[in-house]
């Protein structure tokens, strides 16, 4: 199985300006992400940046990068342009690794690519992990996933699903986790390049805007999303200055990462 990793990177960030170029132990964050991705089985790792500064930073460190438009409304649109620029065949598998995940597990990248390859009927693949904290289950920033018997996604939500009716009283939030353990969605996606190109032309789903979850567009239009359930908790991403300091501390303690 051959696949390509695409790393979309956008310079503007409300909470952390110039995030892709933030220094982590002497390297820009987006370069850290690309280097982690290159430890997977990917045949190619390409950063899709929206600013020449990103492309130049990657070039200085031997990372392949392309310049994409700045006016894309979503990451999916940026991926579609990247697929066109790279001339990828419609059947080619790509894995979208977020540019703010410098601790991404290379094995998780391989698993997401394999999940799509093993499910030819699926348009996308992604990953999930068991939730072991009630606080996480109730946290709207932790996206939950519910799967069918074949491991395909039924729904993603910021709400605590599945709702444990017998574990709550009078509609109040449950005091313990439901069993079996609910699943936390991990924001990594596998696609076939042809689907990436067509995705931006799909009408946005009403629930997509309500939940602010773009993957719901695929489900709303009847496409299957195969889900790999990982038994390894995902590494922390970087959204805020505090997140950045935590990740810097990890690399400072383990420079060989």
From Swiss-Prot:
Pathway: Nucleotide-sugar biosynthesis; CMP-3-deoxy-D-manno-octulosonate biosynthesis; CMP-3-deoxy-D-manno-octulosonate from 3-deoxy-D-manno-octulosonate and CTP: step 1/1; Bacterial outer membrane biogenesis; lipopolysaccharide biosynthesis. GO terms for molecular function: 3-deoxy-manno-octulosonate cytidylyltransferase activity. It comes from the Bacteria. It is found in: Cytoplasm. Keywords: Cytoplasm, Lipopolysaccharide biosynthesis, Nucleotidyltransferase, Transferase. GO terms for biological process: CMP-keto-3-deoxy-D-manno-octulosonic acid biosynthetic process; lipopolysaccharide biosynthetic process. Its EC number is 2.7.7.38. Its main location: cytoplasm. Transmembrane segments: none annotated. Belongs to the KdsB family. Activates KDO (a required 8-carbon sugar) for incorporation into bacterial lipopolysaccharide in Gram-negative bacteria. NCBIfam families: kdsB, PRK05450.1-5, PRK13368.1. This is 3-deoxy-manno-octulosonate cytidylyltransferase. It comes from Variovorax paradoxus (strain S110). The lineage of its organism: Bacteria, Pseudomonadati, Pseudomonadota, Betaproteobacteria, Burkholderiales. The gene is kdsB.
